[in-house]
Amino acid sequence: EIVASDWSSDVCSSDLLLDNKSILITGGTGSFGKAFTKYVLDNYNPRKIIIYSRDEFKQFIMQNEFKQYADKLRFFIGDVRDKERLTRAFEGVDYVIHAAALKQVPACEYNPAEAIKTNIHGAQNVIDATLDTGVKKVVALSTDKAVNPVNLYGGTKLVSDKLFIAANAYAGSKDICFSIVRYGNVAGSRGSVIPFFHNIIKNGGTELPITDYRMTRFWISLQQGVELVIKALEESKGGETFISKIPSFKITDLAQAMLPGCEMPEVGIREGEKLHEIMVTVEDSMNTYEYDKHFIVYPQMVWSESRRAVPTGKRVAEGFSYSSGNNTEWLSVEQIRELLKTIDLEK
């Protein structure tokens, strides 16, 4: 039997990395922010966790969900577009997790200037606020869509990634480190295929539309996303991109796991959508090293000898790439069915 934990990262909390530390999460009321907050509060003893986000109502809901941790949690209303507010919020913070983004692909296509303000200018504001305060480490969340981007959202995240990697050059003598964590759609996250299918089934639908029968995706749980961020906080020296090793699945197999024997009309690929999620390109592979449960793409720039990240993993073969289409590990229909039980689709 396959369970989600079989693909869990080997996070080592023995060095109590987050104990007595102050951590701020931009976009902290989202699904990642909530899961990260819960994981840290359950496994460490942080000084405080600051949730920095725009929506007062979502903060109110999260405050109620985390009532028992009230003494450890702070809620700041603020936008990553507002550098002054960010700088004030970063005072006294040790680690920043940058999760705030406009991430719905169609919304970004339709409102490109807004996506640029949040995803690109917001990233630069986080960097500037970090350099102006005492923050030690920043981990920015990226996406497979930033790799060979075909839509505006992916384009903005590519620029954001480049900004965070280059930001290490501006740290100078300060002990500051910026790194990136890249993963695909979290299984069951808002706006992804699992809730979409679930809704059709719930409303009595008997067929599940597939954009392209060849389409594949990675399966990553929220827990694995959180653990990869902890891994980056533990190990990053500056400029690395951390990528989880996770299994792939075919969208047709997902449909059969959710509604066995259903009709699957092929409706055509949507604008800005890829057949396969790409995590590491052939070009990236020159600087990519493999570890037990993840890959790291190391930066091409070296800022100073003391800040150089020395790879201890195995260099990947020439011509290597990592996508949901060429993965070595695949989920069967039965395995998908088991993993679906771990997702709360009624939330």
Question: Residue spans of the language-model regions?
Answer:
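Single conserved hydrophobic/aromatic residue that forms the stacking wall/gate
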Residues: 1-12
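N-terminal Rossmann NAD(P)H-binding glycine-rich loop of SDR-like oxidoreductase domains
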Residues: 21-41
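Conserved glycine-rich Rossmann-like NAD(P)H-binding loop of the short-chain dehydrogenase/reductase
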Residues: 45-58
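Conserved residues in the N-terminal Rossmann fold of short-chain dehydrogenase/reductase
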Residues: 53, 76-77, 117, 266
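Conserved Rossmann-fold cofactor-binding substructure of NAD(P)-dependent oxidoreductases
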Residues: 74-95
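Conserved Rossmann-fold NAD(P)-dependent oxidoreductase catalytic core, especially the SDR/UDP-sugar
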Residues: 95-98, 102-158, 162, 166
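NAD(P)-dependent short-chain dehydrogenase/reductase
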Residues: 152-153, 158-236, 247-261
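C-terminal substrate-binding subdomain of Rossmann-fold SDR/epimerase-dehydratase oxidoreductases
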Residues: 209-347
